[in-house]
Amino acid sequence: MARAFPLERVRNIGIAAHIDAGKTTCTERILFYSGVVHKMGEVHDGAAVTDWMAQERERGITITAAAISTTWDDHRINIIDTPGHVDFTIEVERSMRVLDGVIAVFCAVGGVQPQSETVWRQADRYSVPRMVFVNKMDRTGADFLKVHGQIKDRLKANAVPIQLPIGAENDLKGIIDLVENKAYIYKDDLGKDIEQTEVPSDMVDLVSDWRSKLMESIAETEEELLEAFLENGELTIEQLKSGIREGVLKHGVVPMLCGSAFKNKGVQLLLDAVVNYLPAPVDVPPIQGLLPNGKEAVRPSDDGAPFSALAFKVMADPYGKLTFVRMYSGVLEKGSYVLNSTKDAKERISRLIILKADDREEVDELRAGDLGAVLGLKNTTTGDTLCASEEAIVLETLYIPEPVISVAVEPKTKSDMEKLGKALTSLSEEDPTFRVSTDQETNQTVIAGMGELHLEILVDRMLREFKVEANIGAPQVSYRETIRASSSGEGKFARQTGGKGQYGHVVIEVEPGEPGTGFEFVNKIVGGSVPKEYIKPAESGMRETCESGVIAGYPLIDVKVTLVDGSYHDVDSSEMAFKIAGSMAFKDGIKKCNPVLLEPMMKVEVEVPEDFLGSIIGDLSSRRGQVEGQSIEDGQSKVQSKVPLAEMFGYATQLRSMTQGRGIFSMEFSTYEEVPRNVAEAIISKNQGNS
């Protein structure tokens, strides 16, 4: 089957921003103007096409990354609308991993906000080219150039306006295109009757000034353009367009556009910019991966290359399990068999789907550069590679953050107990930041996630989708344990019961690992003191002990273990004996390595009227917070601080009462830090049942 759109005319883009910057409304307008929907859906009415989960429509926020295909100017545009709430950061993370370009939406009033910075960092992590759309230009206090300054200062980006608003707030009449040096005046409320005209006389000087700045910025991106600029004193429209595109692809330029999605202004020009400036799959570097022999390899964006794809999202569906894939190379055909190289398992491709939010179109194949979904894969989860069996490769996977908060879940009835297991399995398959475990002491089921809202939504989904009624415990902090010193450990398990005995013996060295490595195991056995078949069981015993910690029952992180010696018995040694010996050695070593407790620290930004600044700082300090910065703008104070999550429960209520309801705050995970000794002692004592 021939390709519907050449790869050069495909755009895989994401729309990402801080909560309430207007991402979903922006997506809705794109769908309206490109003809996918014929009636606009509004987020506040619960009718947005991309907000298809019940909780999204009720809360007016986007929780999952919805994928939609549309067309514009003879280009295929695949769009992912991502959530802005920090609790759903994995949705943004996995979207960034599979996109070629991003539209970062900023509120013209709020400007750069904490989650905007998080999204920007995520785009940096995956080197995603981007452009900026300053939305809500119709709102009181809207200021395009103020946002431009904030993006340059706070995000350290070379933001270059390629548009200017004509008017602002209630007087937003249209948009100046600085590249074409033209004005677009909106004549109707639907944004379809647009008059292209000359720049208004009262804006000629301002436009001339910003157009010169645009030319200077673009000239600096390429030597040829700089020569042309110095020779002629200006750049042609074509030179400007090609220069902006090159600048975006090389991460040297971030074009800035403006408008009001809600008031239907600026969306068609935004679509033009997506086509003109954001990359096609062939414009970005080919995806890298590892071959079975451990060598690095790349897969070019080409239908003729061996098939490779990344599963970036798994979702429960009435017809079975939907696995969203980004096609990187080759062709995937319905009815074929492929390899899941991450799990070394074969998968059959029963049905292929292209999604239009909650609508779908079945197709016979997906090609390089496509975003689509596969129905009915058995073994594939988020971050897995699918590839041709004869051309195996494992692609770079996703960064998955650790959960920071947990609650106990207790089903109300026996039938709920049976349904709970099914619900938790399904939800954890969909969301890698949602973890399920069993408390060894109480035998309770414990669920962990990225924040209170994250867990609240998941519990709500258990009730709605799986009909599970459960009692939910109070939120608990997900502490971690680590070590600060190095030592050795030894474990010898020897037991004689009747005939065959049990014997396993290992000697290890334990030391702090690199931050973010979790548990690292190195085998340095020489001469066969521990046979090869017993090394994996010994490691397994250590890993399991790692999960339950040694001082307070929390998982151990950033620990490096080296297996250096041991002994075995020809008759009595077994895998189980070495697993137990490994666990014993690990406990022995860790106790001598100065184990400490770590707690999640949150990056907290509070915005309050100036009068309340003193009491807010005092309150944050009383919560063991460290104030890292503050600023005052237009009578509003912003305080940036780092506060332990354990001290932040109930903060929203406290902030409301301290500021008469006029304060707002945002919170996101920052890092794990050591718990002060007096606090740690209380936590350890409580967990050991001594309090």
UniProtKB/Swiss-Prot annotation:
It is found in: Cytoplasm. GTP binds at residues 17-24, 81-85, 135-138. InterPro entries: EFG_II, EFG_III, EFG_III/V, EFG_IV, EFG_V, EFG_V-like, EFTu-like_2, G_TR_CS. Keywords: Cytoplasm, Elongation factor, GTP-binding, Nucleotide-binding, Protein biosynthesis. The keyword GTP-binding applies. GO terms for molecular function: GTP binding; GTPase activity; translation elongation factor activity. This is Elongation factor G. It comes from Prochlorococcus marinus (strain NATL2A). The lineage of its organism: Bacteria, Bacillati, Cyanobacteriota, Cyanophyceae, Synechococcales. The gene is fusA.
